[in-house]
Amino acid sequence: MYEKLEQLLNDLKSMNLKPFIGYGNPDAKILIVGKECTAPNGSDGWKKFYEPNFNQWKKSFEGHGFDFKSGVEPHDFEHGNFHPINPYYKLENKKQSKKKEVGRPSATYYYYQRLVDMIRTGNDVEYKKSDCIDFFKDCFITELNDICRPNDSGLNKPEHEKIEESIRVRFDWMRKTNFFNQFKVVILACGPYAEAIKKDEILRTELYGNASIVYCHQLSYWDKSLENEIPKIQESLAKK
């Protein structure tokens, strides 16, 4: 089970790296790539959700297993309640308002769910909306930039250069491993961060193999262009 993910962890360990791998089903056919985690480095959210991600996966293979359940209390992070294969289970499929209601997803996860529901059942008019956030069972999600921040607005030149270097480092180890090139569909929901991938076919193939690539902006709000991509995505997923 999840042999390619286990091999990725071993390869990264041999490189002395413990990056954020991602969340979701490691054997899924869909990969969604966001920009970066929004919890600032060193914050409580970063310490609970982002920084331990490598070790959470590693411990799963070392005996913890891959079971998950609904947390007894909101934000219950004990292993088995919070698990990277299906984190934050079980969230209601209603977007958080400015009040940040517990038990509801962020805007980004809400729109990830809409996208996956559309892929599963039809188009933006006819798709069936899931009752809870369950897109993780049909996709794996990760980030392109390992520097966590709420957004990338107002950054100065040195900060932009740090982001570019972070992405280059991720590209480097991705080239040397064989996990992220296994997916049939890769949705690059990271806007301008994906420009180098869009322009360079060799880089694109090195990172994502022969996957069908879809580009859109970061999904903290809906991207209407995705509605035209649904038939293409469904066709790619149907291929053997």
Model regions and ranges:
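C-terminal capping/extension of enzyme domains
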Residues: 1-12, 97-98, 156-178, 192-240
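A polyanion-binding, active-site-adjacent surface
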Residues: 1-181
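Short, solvent-exposed loop/turn segments at secondary-structure junctions
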Residues: 36-40, 145-149, 191-196, 218-222
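Short, Asp-centered acidic motifs that coordinate Mg2+ and/or phosphate
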Residues: 185
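Redox-cofactor binding/interface segments in oxidoreductases and associated redox assembly factors
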Residues: 188
